[in-house]
Design a protein with these regions (language model features):
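PLP-dependent aspartate aminotransferase-fold enzymes
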Residues: 77-171
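Residue-level signal for well-ordered, solvent-exposed loop/turn and beta-edge residues enriched
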Residues: 28-29, 183
Length: 202
């Protein structure tokens, strides 16, 4: 069996990482500006995380959310304090795509609507609704092309106001910094305009 062809592969075999550096099989050192799709924000092989993860896996690698897990409760408590959202609930999942999928689903449960605003060149994942919110027709299968999403130009505040005024928007999904889109940053005005959805129950 071969690996599924997800991306064009660079001819490099990374075998080790430490801090912000990685090494290939030939021992060539690289400064890691990629970070595994920008998800390795803590760097590689940090001794604290290596110790904590090793200890946890040695005791219990995984169990169900249907039993008490004190470690999960500690994470929720600490994250609440750090973020300032102590009155929120933490839903632990495996990936950004799952996070986006469930956020959109919860929004739809809340207001009963089905239309989502996303932005040109956005990337939100490869699962069902997350991929539909991703502005890339080449990875949206016919089964995912359900007309739930309208794509607006990033930083077009007037387009956002007009779309929200229709009254049928379930949610607005936006990246803090677009990665796939070319490191584009929403302006302060654009980010503020997404808060207009609150007045439209979205």
């Amino acid at each position: 069996m071969k690996l599924f062809d997800v991306y064009p592969l660079y001819n490099i075999n990374i075998v080790k990482g430490k801090g912000c550096k990685v090494w290939d099989e030939n021992g060539t050192e690289y400064l890691d500006l990629y970070g595994g799709h920008a998800v390795i924000s803590i760097g590689h092989a940090h001794p604290h995380y290596v110790e904590m993860i090793s200890n946890q896996v040695a005791n219990l690698g995984f169990y169900s959310n249907s039993v008490i897990n004190k470690l999960q409760q500690q994470v929720a408590e600490r994250l609440g304090k750090i973020s300032g959202y102590e009155d929120y609930s933490l839903f632990l999942i495996n990936s950004g795509a799952e996070a986006n999928e469930n956020a959109l689903k919860l929004a739809s449960f809340h207001n009963g609507r089905t239309k989502v605003v996303s932005f040109s060149k956005a990337f939100h994942g490869r699962t069902s609704l997350a991929v539909e919110a991703t502005n890339n027709p080449s990875i949206i299968a016919p089964i995912n092309n359900n007309g739930h999403v309208v794509y607006l130009p990033l930083n077009d505040v007037e387009a956002m106001k007009q779309e929200l005024s229709r009254g049928d928007i379930c949610a607005v999904i936006i990246e803090g910094i677009q990665g796939v889109g070319g490191i584009k940053i929403p302006t302060t005005e654009d980010r503020k305009s997404t808060r207009l959805n609150s007045s439209h129950n979205a």
